[in-house]
Amino acid sequence: MITKNPMQLKAFIKNKAAEKHISAQLVMQNYMLERLLERISLSPYKNNFILKGGFLISALVGLDTRATMDLDTTIKGFTLTHEAIRKIFTEICAIQIADDVQLEVVGISDIRETDDYPGIRVALKANYPPISVPLTVDVTTGDMITPREVEYTFSLLFDDRTISILAYNLETVLAEKLETVLSRNIANTRPRDYYDVHILYALRGAECDKATLRRALERTTQKRGSGLILTDYPEIMKEIRESDTLRRLWEKYSREYEYAKDISFDDTCNTIQTIMDAIKV
């Protein structure tokens, strides 16, 4: 989107935030991540990056239904090293688009929070002076995508056009979320995992192929060494439902996010149970 000046961009952002009932900061963050994504789609590396995580879920269900602050991708076709990632992102940031935004790489670090897949975190800055927005991109490798990534048509926030990127298929997104919820059991302190399963299935469940989802979940649990959840899920769900801590966390989450306020913790648990019963191995 071409804007006359930063004030005009801020006005667009403010209007979109009011329309979607989310904060202007979230809309600005998503707009700048979108600017990065368009550069990836125009780069020689467009077939090496596969979009996943919260940004993809937001694209699937709508920004007013699921907001996120960072970008998650997996890569294929080259070895994941600090040097390679710095070179690739420096090249991507150098791509010029008529959007007045300049991107720069600020830092590269290892992802420490999860052992699911090896990963690197890229810190970037999106500049449209005096606007400066810090961005985070997590890059992993070795992800289990079943059966394969898909070409996803991504609608832009302010322009009446789309960009094409590779992304996880719906079944793999759901499989990873289900595995996370069930394997972490009552130790999971992230209500959004429950929300994501619920909203994806509510809005996109009709498009989900049950046999593919079953296979995706089997392969994800094999990769993560959590195969027991496939048979133990009724007991796990009973523990989850009885957890006062998880209920309190959910109540806090639903107060914080407008889009979750009419969904109960039991609703999310019922959705997970329904999916698992439907794909019973």
Regions found by a protein language model. Name each.
Residues 56:
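Catalytic metal-binding/acid-base residues of hydrolase active sites
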Residues 1-49, 59-67, 71-281:
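Structured mid-to-C-terminal alpha-helical surface segments
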